[in-house]
Each structure stands twice: as structure tokens, then as C-alpha cells.
Amino acid sequence: TSVYQLLPLYPAIKIGSEFVRVTETDQVPNVNAARAHDARAFHDEIYDAVESHKNDDEYKNNFITVPVIGIKQPTLQSAELVEGKLVASQVLPQVLAKQPDFVDGDGTVPKISAIPNELSNSFNNRFIAEAHGALQNQEQILQSVKEAISTTQFANAADIRDVQNTIGLAVDDLYLPDEPIILEATVVSQPDIVGLKAVVVPASSDEPPLTFSFDQSQAQQWMLTIPQLPAGLYRVAIIAEGTETQTLPPPVHNLFEVIDRVD
């Protein structure tokens, strides 16, 4: 049931011309309806508890929730039932069609799903251009948490601003042995960066890091094609290059794997 608890609560499955929730259809194959409804009930319990705590001053004053939300990474948003199979897509579901600012996420979790319901309009939300698997190690986030903790004695400390300069990275999770490894990056920076590089570190061996330079394909678009890499798991960091006085977008990190040849 825990896997079902990760499914969207909003209508994210397109069947015909309509978007429905997982619990509203029996047409999706391999879905256990009972577990789907149990998962929805679990979230309803959380919602009810949040509502009851709104009237509990002692509970409200015990802690502060500060969500850290990854953005600017290509993220799957919905799925369409096509010939009996679900096809995932980055297209926003109908319920979010008028919210184009929700079109991204951290590469795993859509932006809308990363924001707790009770904090939908909160200034405590923190947004960072980083991938899901690297959020907990992101230097800017850790520095932000450190500064927030050190200034808790100030009742009205200024809110930490969102990141202006960002890097968004599109990279597949898995590559075949003879398949080129294509990385695509979207860079928002004022002033423009002068270069972009990828530092690829083998995670499953002691081989030294490899550094590759992106080519700029359009104003904010950069592309890198790595012809081949030995089979293994790799960490990749995308790093902007600029002048000494320029404030650069913070690096973005992710993982990918090259599999052994399958005969």
C-alpha cells in the first residue's frame, strides 16, 4: 500500500478526453483498487489531522515546517491510457492547465506534489533548481538551513529569496552500452554564462572524474553528447562557468547508469 500512497491525489490519468484519479477508474491494468482506496484514506486522515491541529495553539507553536522543493527539472506530470497501457507524460493534467508555473519539479516529484496542502500559500516554502536525489546534499540548501537556525532568535527574520539563476538538467536514468549519452540543460542566468561543463564521476569504481563541455544550441539551451562510457553507475554535476565577478547558477546533480551488453 505504501507505493499507492505515492500516487497523485488529483486527476492525473487521462482516459479518452477526461482526467480521472486512480480511485475513480477500474480501467488501469495491474492496479489494486482496495490498496488505492486505502492510500487515499491515509491522505484523508492526514488532511483531517492538519485541520484539527489548526485550532491547537500548543501544537502549532511546537515547530515550523519548511518544505524544500526541487524545481526547474523536467518532471513527469500525468499519464494517458493508450491501448490498455499507461503512457507517462510531462503534460500537465487538466486541473493544472491554467497553472503553467507547475510544469516542472525535481525530476521525480512534480512541484504541485511537493507542496503540503496546508502550506500552499506559505512563504516558508523553499525552492531550489536541483534534482530529487541531490536535494539533501545541496550546498545552498544546507547553508540556508544553517542560516535559518542561527537566526531563530529574530521573530521577523527576512524570508530567504528564491534562486534567480538556475540550471535545469534532462538526463535519462539508463543507457545501453552502445547508446550515446545525451545531456540537455536549460540555463537561466543574468548575465549569461560563458560556458557549461559536466563532471562525470564513476560511482562504482575508483576511476577519476571525467569533464565534458556543453555546446550552446539556443539562447538558454545547452547540449552535450558523450559517445560511450563503460558499464556502471555515474554521478554527474552540471557546473556553469562565467566571469570572476558573476553570480553563477548553483550546480545541479543527478545519477545515470550504463548497463552491460545483453546478448
Feature-to-residue mapping (PLM):
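Helical cap/lid subdomain of alpha/beta-hydrolase-fold lipid enzymes
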Residues: 1-161
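Short, compositionally biased P/S/T/A/G/V-rich stretches that sit at domain boundaries
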Residues: 149-182, 188, 261-263
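Extracellular acidic, Ser/Thr/Pro-rich low-complexity tracts
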Residues: 186-192, 202
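Aromatic sugar-binding surface patches on proteins
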Residues: 215-225
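Short beta-strand elements
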Residues: 243-263
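Extracellular recognition modules
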Residues: 235-239
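Surface-exposed, short loops/turns at beta-strand junctions within beta-sandwich domains
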Residues: 226-233
